[in-house]
From Swiss-Prot:
Keywords: Cataract, Congenital muscular dystrophy, Cytoplasm, Disease variant, Endoplasmic reticulum, Hydrolase, Intellectual disability, Lipid metabolism
Gene3D superfamilies: 2.60.40.2840, Endonuclease/exonuclease/phosphatase
Source species: Homo sapiens (Human)
Designated name of the protein: Inositol polyphosphate 5-phosphatase K
Catalytic activity, EC: 3.1.3.56, 3.1.3.86, 3.1.3.36
Recorded name of the encoding gene: INPP5K
Pfam families in the cross-refs: Exo_endo_phos2 (PF22669), SKICH (PF17751)
Compartments, record wording: Endoplasmic reticulum; Cytoplasm
Entry superkingdom: Eukaryota
């Protein structure tokens, strides 16, 4: 998956939905259909990128979340897994959480390179502020995703810009042949950036919002001003702010702050992106899209119906047009060749000549609708369970003795230890009923 050679003329379009929300320690609401665009059949989404800030990070909550999935991750997996989305990766630093979900057919073409946390609170020692990053390869292209929470208050604009630079500086992925983050094909950067509206008073800002006169407010938005003066920040693009400022609201209402502080509304919650600069582009010219890799914004909006926080969530929907650098998976699993004997199921698979196999690779058996790679019902270590190997065709056996008789469909996934990713996935199939035991109460227990 390290080759940069274009592999065939056929292009591919991926639809990506990005969400940022400062949830102010609240539990998930009952319904996220609007935020996740679940009822919009025209979107046909491929990937969800979800960043949350200010998750409950009390000591009891953190200890519980270390042993189990946090309530937001569990809720999102429950919502998205029936739609064939699988949690690909996540990273959390105290109250800052980043999650990536993808349709299962894309898994063999997503390689997780690294996850990283950069604390900037308390002089860089505390993770209540800072950024978290997932660095991955998507169909052979380098993509970095950053969720951040920058310092608050209108007077801390310079500190926000310093933290922005600090987070970017610390996000370089470790490993051979991984380019500097600024040489990645795409950076998606979002979060509670906390930029405020300068100069204008509270009454003027609220009246402008009431009359939907946002143009004058854009000119005094601190992020918009900074982009005019900072060459690197200028390379990050953003959609037009055609929605009301997303902070600060009274909870469970659409009323801006009525407390004694009466904070001035601001567009604190933002979604930015940056495409790799092409050699022909100068430092002061817009970045032209590469002919084989381009990103377009389909929609950028806030979601005013949610009131659990003093922030409103923001989403951006993108179309990523790319010409895959990787056109075939590293592993091909062949359920049509599986057969059973006693309590075991034999699985055949083939690998590419350059696949870096490891004895610690494993093949998982999953029910269709899995939430993440740990939801297997059985598995086999490739190094321990391989029974034959010839002409690049391998066979392993998987224990199915604890799987009750069912008409459910299953999937096989091959997990590469060295690549830290699923590198092969089978089509759905059913296991012949005679191969499964009839006790409906038995369930396989994960061993890893």
């Amino acid at each position: 998956m390290s080759s940069r050679k274009l592999s065939g003329p056929k292009g591919r379009r991926l639809s990506i939905h990005v969400v940022t929300w400062n949830v102010a320690s609240a539990a998930p609401p009952l319904d996220l259909s609007d935020l996740l665009q679940l009822n919009n059949r025209n979107l046909n989404l491929d990937i969800y990128v979800i960043g949350l800030q200010e998750l409950n990070s009390g000591i009891i909550s953190l200890l519980s979340d270390a042993a189990f999935n946090d309530s937001w991750s569990s809720f999102l997996m429950d919502v998205l897994s029936p739609l064939s989305f699988i949690k690909v990766s996540h990273v959390r630093m105290q109250g800052i959480l980043l999650l990536v979900f993808a349709k299962y057919q894309h898994l063999p073409y997503i390689q997780i390179l690294s996850t990283k946390s950069t604390p900037t609170g308390l002089f860089g020692y505390w993770g209540n502020k800072g950024g978290v990053n997932i660095c991955l390869k998507l169909y052979g292209y380098y993509v970095s995703i950053i969720n951040c929470h920058l310092p608050p208050h209108i007077s801390n604009n310079y500190q926000r810009l310093e933290h922005f630079d600090r987070i970017l500086e610390m996000q370089n992925c470790e490993g051979r042949d991984i380019p500097n983050i600024l040489d990645h094909d795409l950076i998606i950067w979002f979060g509670d950036m906390n930029f405020r509206i300068e100069d204008f008073g509270l009454h003027f800002v609220r009246e402008s919002i009431k009359n939907r006169c946002y143009g004058g407010l854009w000119e005094k938005d601190q992020l918009s001003i900074a982009k005019k003066h900072d060459p690197l920040l200028r390379e990050f693009q953003e959609g037009r702010l055609l929605f009301p400022p997303t902070y600060k609201f009274d909870r469970n209402s659409n009323d801006y702050d009525t407390s004694e502080k009466k904070r001035k509304p601001a567009w604190t919650d933002r979604i930015l992106w940056r495409l790799k600069r092409q050699p022909c582009a100068g430092p002061d010219t817009p970045i032209p899209p590469a002919s084989h890799f381009s990103l377009s914004l389909r929609g950028y909006s806030s979601h005013m119906t949610y009131g659990i926080s003093d922030h409103k969530p923001v989403s951006g929907t993108f179309d990523l047009e790319l010409k895959p650098l990787v056109s075939a998976p590293l592993i091909v699993l062949m359920p049509e060749d599986l057969w059973t004997v006693e309590n075991d199921m034999m699985v055949s698979y083939s690998s590419t000549s350059d696949f870096p196999s490891s004895p610690w690779d494993w093949i998982g058996l999953y029910k269709v609708g899995l939430r993440d790679v740990n939801d297997y019902v059985s598995y086999a270590w490739v190094g321990d369970s391989k029974v034959s190997c010839s002409d690049n065709l391998n066979q392993v056996y998987i224990d199915i003795s604890n799987i009750p008789t069912t008409e459910d469909e299953f999937l096989l996934c091959y997990y590469s230890n060295s690549l830290r990713s699923v590198v092969g996935i089978s089509r759905p199939f059913q296991i012949p009923p005679g191969s499964l035991r009839e006790d409906p109460l038995g369930e396989a227990q994960p061993q890893i």
